[in-house]
C-alpha cells in the first residue's frame, strides 16, 4: 500500500532564493516592470525633493523674523517655492497611483503563470507523490499559497522597493544636511534593525507552521465531507469533530503566534524611532541655538529624520504578508521541483484505420510490430516503500485475448499488479513485457493508451454525460459514445436523465447512483476500445441484476482483448481463462475455475463459503 502521508513541514531553505525565483516569473512582464521602476524612482525623487525644498522657505521666513520686517520675504519667491513643493507632492502621488495599477496587472499575470506551471507539472508527477500528500495540502498550494504570493507582489514588493529608494534618498539628504545628526539616526536605526530581525525570525517560523497546519486542516475537512456518509453510518460525528478540533487548534495556535510577532514589529520599531527622533531634536536644537545650524536645515533634517524610519517601518508592517508569501512560495516551488515521472521509453504506439479496420502497432525504430496484447510478468518483486515488499516473485502470462482474473483478500496485491501493468510504479526486480517488449522501453503515454481501466473508485468529471464517456477517447464521435454506452448497458438509464446525454453531472457524478457511475466508467473504457482491458473490481458496486444485465455486453467488449479482472464476486471470474489466487503478495494457486475447484485449495474454500475474501 502507499507510504504514509506527510504531516510535517519544512522551513524555507533560502528565503532570498525563493524571493528571487518569484521575481523571475514577474520578470516576464519586463516592460511593465520597467514602467513600475521608473514610476518608483520618480515618486521617490518627488517626495524626497519636496521635503528638501522646505529649507529655503524656512530660512527666508527666519531671516524676516530676525529682521523684524516680513516684507523682506519676497511674495513671488514664497509662492513659487510653495508651488514647487505642492507640484512635487502631487507628482509623487500620481506616480504612486500609476505604479500601483501596473503592479496589480503584473501580480495577477505572475500568479497566473505560477498556477499554470504548477498544474502542468502536477500532470507529470508520479503516483507516489499523491500517495504522500493529502488533497487538502495540494489544494492549499493552488489557493492560499499562490494567493499570498499575489498579495506580496501587489502590495509588499512595491512597498519594499519604494521604501528602499526612499531610504537611499533620505540618507543622501541627511548626510548632506548634517553628518553629526545623521550618525545619531544611524545608531537608532541599527538598534531597530537588530530588534526587528530577531522578532522577524520568530514570526517567520510561525507563519511556516500556519501554512502547513492550514493545508492539513483543509485535508481533514475535505476528507470529512467526502466521507460524511461513512461518518454518519458509524455514528462517528464526535470523533470527526474531535479530529477537526485538533487541526483547528494547531492552526489557531500557529496563526496567533505568527500574527502576534508580526504585529509586535510596528510598535517596537516605532518606540525606538521616537526615542531617536527626540534625541535628534534635542541635539539639533542645541546646534541651532548656538548658531552652528540654520533653522531651515534643522527643521528640514527633522522632517527627514521622521521619514528616515518610515521605510523601515513600512517594511516591518509588511513582514506578515512577506513571510506568509515566502512560506507559501516555498511549498509551491517544492511541488514544482518534485521530479517528474521518468520515461525513457522509445517504443511508440501507432493506430491506423477506424472501427473494424482499426489496427494497433508498436513502432520500435524502423520495425513495426502488431499489438496483440500478450502480457507477461517474469519474477516480479515490488514494494511501494523499500522496507515493505507487497509482491513477491510474481510470474504470469496472459496470451492475446485471454481473460485473467485475480482473486484474494484485501491487501493481497491484486490492484498493485494492475498498477504495474500501467507502469504507475516501477518494479524493483524482474521484468514485465507487452508483446515481448519490456514495458520500460515503451513510452508511458503510448503504453497507457493501449490500455483501458475501470477503476475501483469511479471518478466522473463535472461535465455532461457525453463528455464523461468521451474522456476515454477525446476524438470519439457522439455516435461512438452512444454505441459504447449501449455496449455497457448504460444507454437506457442515460435516456431517462433530464437532458439525456447532455445532462450535466455534479461533482464526481453525485447526482447518479453508484451503479450508474460504474456503468459510465465501463462505457468510457468501451469507447477507448484498446487491446488490453483492466477491470479493477468493476462490478463490485453494481447490484446483481445490473451485473447480469451487463455481462453479455462486457463479454462482447472483451472479445479479442486481453483482460485482467479483479472482482469481489467470484461469479464474475468463473469464465476466465486463468485465475490467480493471491495471498500476502504471492500467487498461491493458478488455473481455470474447474482446475482450481478440483484442487480443493484456497479458491475452493472461497467458492464454497468455507473462507471469505475479507
For each predicted feature, which ranges?
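Alpha-helical segments in transporter systems
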Residues: 20, 31-56, 81, 85, ...
